[in-house]
Amino acid sequence: SGNVAEAPKHYHCSYEDADIVMREWYHVWGSG
């Protein structure tokens, strides 16, 4: 997660990473 360069290599994890990113995004923007 967080490493765009690894996205193509670990594309099968994109959904898991997206879930983590969205949770972090919600935490940052949802609290502001």
Curated annotation (Swiss-Prot):
Report whether Metal-binding shows up as a keyword of the record.
yes
Which terms are listed as keywords in the entry?
Answer: Heme, Iron, Metal-binding, Oxygen transport, Transport
Q: Which domain of life is it from?
A: Eukaryota
Q: What does the record give under GO molecular function? A: metal ion binding; oxygen carrier activity
Q: Which family does it belong to?
A: Belongs to the globin family.
How does this protein assemble? Giant hemoglobin is composed of four heme-containing chains (AI to AIV), and two linker chains (AV and AVI).
Q: What is this protein called?
A: Giant hemoglobin AIV chain
Source organism (scientific name): Lamellibrachia sp. (Deep-sea giant tube worm)
